[in-house]
């Protein structure tokens, strides 16, 4: 897993956000075109958190996404979101890696609004950080229900309904 004290690449653009219940750092190491701003990431993270946390959200390009997915999951391609949990105590400590090109391609292919898709995957990562998973069917139902509840409360459409 990446270490919290070492950036994965040189010179990321960091946007630290300090508040008592959430310390959020957003690292933009991919092209920032069409990537939501720190204010939106903060809103989405806070909506999904159930306890204090220190979170780094890192937006990466396809190459870094492929390297991380290969090194930590044994997969040969980039994925949309990876979550690295460092501590399940309070505050939670973890990193969420979002692969910008994968997210953009998925949104286009699925007919989803790009911002809504970023919101969904950020919420998905935060739920993983809190111990939720979707390996077993019954766990997937719980996690997807929570994702849907949170994202619709924020005014976005249900991410599991196919958009036409």
Curated annotation (Swiss-Prot):
HAMAP family from the UniProt entry: Endoribonucl_YbeY
Pfam families: YbeY (PF02130)
Gene from which the chain derives: ybeY
UniProt binding sites for Zn(2+): 124, 128, 134
SUPFAM superfamilies: Metalloproteases ('zincins'), catalytic domain
NCBIfam families: rRNA maturation RNase YbeY
Superkingdom field: Bacteria
E.C. code: 3.1.-.-
Originating organism: Nitrosomonas europaea (strain ATCC 19718 / CIP 103999 / KCTC 2705 / NBRC 14298)
A GO BP entry: rRNA processing
Cofactor(s) the protein requires to work: Zn(2+)
Listed GO CC annotations: cytoplasm
Similarity comment text for this entry: Belongs to the endoribonuclease YbeY family.
Role description: Single strand-specific metallo-endoribonuclease involved in late-stage 70S ribosome quality control and in maturation of the 3' terminus of the 16S rRNA.
UniProt protein name: Endoribonuclease YbeY
Cited PANTHER family: ENDORIBONUCLEASE YBEY, CHLOROPLASTIC
Lineage per the UniProt record: Bacteria, Pseudomonadati, Pseudomonadota, Betaproteobacteria, Nitrosomonadales
GO molecular function: metalloendopeptidase activity; RNA endonuclease activity; zinc ion binding
CC cofactor note: Binds 1 zinc ion.
Matching InterPro entries: MetalPrtase_cat_dom_sf_prd (IPR023091), YbeY (IPR002036), YbeY_CS (IPR020549)
EC class (word): hydrolase
PROSITE patterns in the record: UPF0054
Compartments, as annotated in UniProt: Cytoplasm
